[in-house]
């Protein structure tokens, strides 16, 4: 076994690959050329303290607009990869959640999502609940799919979902 001068790792003299590595290390050590620039030469001082606002998490199906809003879209495989516009959102997370909902509706459990499926399922059920809880005030109109709830002078109908 031959120890290397710069480290204490033993090398097997009978292994040709290790001997080639040993020769390369010795040659590089003999040249003593600094191959990496000094740390203070890498970045100017003002760039080191720059805030990391530019570095944001990338979400599937989400693009950032130049003016700061986030656009969400998904490709529909049933229409040969046509883009389906999902909307513009204030935050990347909202846009990613819109993408996840659409992906889950299109592809089911096989969809590649940005967030865990439990979060997507919960947001879909919350959306469904908010749509179902909308009340409609009418004047004695009856519909077989609506439940009648009496509220003061007007009749309020809530839809069953």
Swiss-Prot record:
UniProt name for this protein: Pathogenesis-related genes transcriptional activator PTI5
Motif, Nuclear localization signal: chain positions: 57-65
InterPro entries assigned: AP2/ERF_dom (IPR001471), AP2/ERF_dom_sf (IPR036955), DNA-bd_dom_sf (IPR016177), ERF_plant (IPR044808)
One Gene Ontology biological process: ethylene-activated signaling pathway
Domain of life (superkingdom): Eukaryota
Keywords attached to this entry: Activator, DNA-binding, Nucleus, Plant defense, Transcription, Transcription regulation
Main location: nucleus
Provenance organism: Solanum lycopersicum
DNA-binding region: 58-116
SUPFAM superfamilies per record: DNA-binding domain (SSF54171)
A GO CC term attached to the entry: nucleus
Gene3D superfamilies linked: AP2/ERF domain (3.30.730.10)
PROSITE patterns to which the protein is assigned, alphabetical: AP2_ERF (PS51032)
Subcellular location: Nucleus
GO molecular function: DNA binding; DNA-binding transcription factor activity
């Amino acid at each position: 076994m031959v120890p290397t001068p710069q480290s204490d790792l033993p090398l097997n003299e009978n292994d040709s690959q290790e001997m080639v590595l040993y020769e390369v290390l010795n040659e590089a050590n003999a040249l003593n050329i600094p191959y990496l620039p000094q740390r203070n030469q890498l970045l100017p001082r003002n760039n080191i303290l720059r805030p990391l606002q530019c570095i944001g998490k990338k979400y599937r199906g989400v693009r950032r607009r130049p003016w700061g809003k986030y656009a969400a879209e998904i490709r529909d495989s049933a229409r040969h990869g046509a883009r389906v516009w999902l909307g513009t959102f204030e935050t990347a997370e909202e846009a990613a959640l819109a993408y996840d909902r659409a992906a889950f509706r299109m592809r089911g459990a096989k969809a590649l999502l940005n967030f865990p499926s439990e979060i997507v399922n919960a947001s879909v059920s919350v959306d469904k609940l908010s749509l179902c809880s909308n009340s409609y005030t009418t004047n004695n109109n009856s519909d077989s799919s609506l439940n009648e709830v009496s509220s003061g002078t007007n009749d309020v109908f809530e839809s069953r979902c």
